[in-house]
Regions:
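Conserved beta-strand-loop-alpha-helix junction that forms the acyl-donor binding cleft
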Residues: 99-108, 124-131
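Conserved acetyl-CoA-binding loop of GNAT-fold acetyltransferases
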Residues: 113-121
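Acetyl-CoA-dependent GNAT
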Residues: 5-73, 79-83, 156
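Glyoxalase I/VOC metalloenzyme domain signal
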Residues: 8, 144-157
Length: 157
């Protein structure tokens, strides 16, 4: 498993992974449309295949993870990519890392909290507002849970 910074040469692979997992290269988060083709981050490769990506943006004194996507689970890909975001926050003298997930994403809530993140807040109804901007957002998410709220998690340096 190798990690490489997203650059001009490999951006298309980052974009492909993001589009595969988010069905678009634009996401709506915190009532903002985010162009994922402009995000900094890292890719993970294994045996020549791109299997994971993490992207982030600068949010003042915090680094904000905008995507963490992996094609494999249980092999440490997500953990290694998330560690890169934490390291970037430290190197850039940030106070920490923030990210948003949705109320249906139980696996993500488990994943992030067992890696030092805690819930900072819940924006009730945020996904409904996002759906007005991006109508392709489904009404139901994982486990047929109604997709309604954004949950912000934070890790402090």
């Amino acid at each position: 498993m190798q990690l490489e910074r997203i650059d001009v040469q490999n951006r298309k692979y980052a974009n492909a992974l993001i589009e595969k997992h988010f069905f678009s290269l634009e996401i709506v988060c915190r009532d903002e449309v985010i162009d994922m083709t402009l995000q900094d981050g890292f890719l993970c490769t294994q045996n020549g295949a791109y299997i994971g990506v993490i992207t982030w943006q600068d949010r003042g004194d915090m680094l904000d993870v905008t995507a963490l996507c992996t094609d494999v689970t249980g092999q440490g890909v997500g953990t290694r990519l998330l560690t890169k975001a934490k390291e970037a926050a430290v190197l850039q003298n940030k106070k920490g890392v923030t990210l948003i997930t949705t109320n249906d994403n139980i696996r993500a809530l488990y994943f992030y909290q067992t890696r030092g993140f805690w819930i900072k807040g819940i924006d009730v109804g945020a996904v409904g507002r996002a759906r007005k901007i991006k109508p392709v957002i489904p009404l139901f998410g994982e486990h047929d849970i109604p997709l309604r709220d954004e949950i912000e998690l934070v890790w402090r340096t």
